[in-house]
Amino acid sequence: MSRATPIQNYRNIGISAHIDAGKTTTTERILFYTGVNHKIGEVHDGAATMDWMEQEQERGITITSAATTCFWKGMDTSLPEHRINIIDTPGHVDFTIEVERSMRVLDGACMVYCAVGGVQPQSETVWRQANKYKVPRLAFVNKMDRTGANFFKVVEQMKLRLKASPVPMVIPIGAEENFTGVVDLLKMKAIIWDEASQGMKFTYSEIPAELVELAKEWREKMVEAAAESSEELMNKYLEEGDLTEAEIKLGIRTRTIASEIQPMYCGSAFKNKGVQRMLDAVIEFMPSPIDIPPVKGMDEDEAPVTRKADDEEKFSALAFKLMTDPFVGQLTFVRVYSGVLKKGDSVYNPIKGKKERIGRIVQMHANNREEVSEIRAGDIAACVGLKDVTTGETLCDPDAIVMLERMVFPEPVITQAVEPKTKADQEKMGIALQRLAQEDPSFRVKTDEESGQTLIAGMGELHLEIIVDRMKREFGVEANVGKPQVAYRETIRKTVEDAEGKFVRQSGGKGQYGHVVLKIEPNEAGKGIEFVDAIKGGVVPREYIPAVEKGINEAVTSGVLAGYPVVDVKVTLHFGSYHDVDSNELAFKMAAIFGFKEGCRKASPVILEPMMAVEVETPEDYAGNVMGDLSSRRGMVQGMEDMVGGGKAIKAEVPLSEMFGYSTTLRSMSQGRATYSMEFKHYSEAPRNVSEAIMASRAK
């Protein structure tokens, strides 16, 4: 079977934004104009196609990235048909992981901003993630029909807050209730959309007289941005003072794909204006899979290899999302980077070292699916039948093994105890939690060894709330949850050269004998636990060294101060002794545990607490109180900025333990007018009085 759409006509894009910037509505409109949705789904009524989980429709926020395919020939059907795969990404801070995993598999992103609220804290987080994966992007300023809408202020904010280089390609005609359309700076014509056909029809007309000068000024900036793409265009521009439409498009496309600039559009998705022009821009300026560098990975000998977006190459893909579907079971969403995958093929997972067979392949339109017999380079689809794949793993041709760069997932910062409301549901709850943890690598489940309680850990209170909610809806398990607990860590500050651990049991018959000497030193932050074998002359026999490492890995799960996991320590095994008869693996494992604990006690152990980047947006009258309150929570205020629509944005770094219940306090302090967002920043040493309180509460 040959390819239905040439690969150069593919666009894999994400639509990404702050909560309430109107991202889901924008996606809905895209699906409407591209002809797959005949009745527009409104988020206001909780009926949007992309928000397909019940909780999303209830809360009006998008949680999971649904992947959808649609086709577009341009607003005036003058372009060849392009296939656009859209991944809708959530805008809530607790779901940053979702954004991160979708950025990894996208070729381009469309950033949606609110014309009133402008660039919000979450927009900055998403922008940083797009920078990390070098994703080219364009911007769409939505809600131009709202009171206080200001397109040009958002342009300035993008430069200021995101250090972006936006290039407006259109300017708005009017604003608020007088917003009627846009001036297309490429054609220097006004575009007015017809309201009766929900924006399906439009007309080009002359630019309103009062906007002619402004349009010329912005066109000049756009042409200049295009000219900077090459010496050839720059020379022509300097000589003739202008460029043709084709030259401008080429220049803007080249610089957008190189992430040097971001074309900028505006409109009102709710009023069916402007989204159509932005769709054209996706085709004109976003890269196809062959416009971006080949994907990098390692072969089975760990030598670097690349895979081109080409059907002739061997198959390679990345599983970027798992979803449990009530009808077909587990769906594994994959982005194909190279080659072809047919229904019934076997694929190899190099991380698990396992071969699995693909049952069926489905392509999604939001929550509707269509079965396909094969997928090719550049495609995004869901596979049915894979039992043992976790998010972020590679799937490849068993005869040409490649391991693509893995995604890095953040460690959870908050823990809660959870138990089923009825004892009979215990097993059911276990299955549900395992399934959910497989889908979302930033969510973990473990059993507390002392209390036997089930603990769930995630990125924030809302994250865990939604997990508990999903257990109830999807698996029929109702659960009670304990108070949220902070995920503290322990580490050391000093080096101990000779930490000795001995495990000797010799009282007639076969005994036990293990003896190790360890050097224990602080490791770089974020480096984790590192084990080095520096044994010379066989003082500890080879076969016992894995047991020593196993002992260390066991010991680090519970630190010496308060039993929290130990991080960022380097352990070197450099001496020891053994007994011909009595030594065994268990003895060396125990010796390593004792040695490590002994060493940590002498190495100035400290407790680390998670610090959160908090941003509060408040009317000016309450700014003083907000800052005072953050300081009383051991917060460090790092700055205050003026916001677009008035008010102040206060940035601070605050320990997570001080932030529980903050939303209630903030609401009463500001009469419900201030809002805040927070995300995990890093771990830092807890002050002495805090550490003592933590240790005392753990000792109870």
UniProtKB/Swiss-Prot annotation:
GO terms for molecular function: GTP binding; GTPase activity; guanosine tetraphosphate binding; translation elongation factor activity. One of its GO terms (cellular component) is cytoplasm. Transmembrane segments: none annotated. SUPFAM superfamilies: EF-G C-terminal domain-like, P-loop containing nucleoside triphosphate hydrolases, Ribosomal protein S5 domain 2-like, Translation proteins. InterPro entries: EFG_II (IPR041095), EFG_III (IPR009022), EFG_III/V (IPR035647), EFG_IV (IPR047872), EFG_V (IPR035649), EFG_V-like (IPR000640), EFTu-like_2 (IPR004161), G_TR_CS (IPR031157). GTP binds at residues 17-24, 88-92, 142-145. Keywords: Cytoplasm, Elongation factor, GTP-binding, Nucleotide-binding, Protein biosynthesis. It is found in: Cytoplasm. Its main location: cytoplasm. Gene3D superfamilies: 3.30.230.10, 3.30.70.240, Elongation Factor G (Translational Gtpase), domain 3, P-loop containing nucleotide triphosphate hydrolases, Translation factors. One of its GO terms (biological process) is ribosome disassembly. The keyword Ligase does not apply. SMART domains: EFG_C, EFG_IV. Catalyzes the GTP-dependent ribosomal translocation step during translation elongation. During this step, the ribosome changes from the pre-translocational (PRE) to the post-translocational (POST) state as the newly formed A-site-bound peptidyl-tRNA and P-site-bound deacylated tRNA move to the P and E sites, respectively. Catalyzes the coordinated movement of the two tRNA molecules, the mRNA and conformational changes in the ribosome. This is Elongation factor G 1.
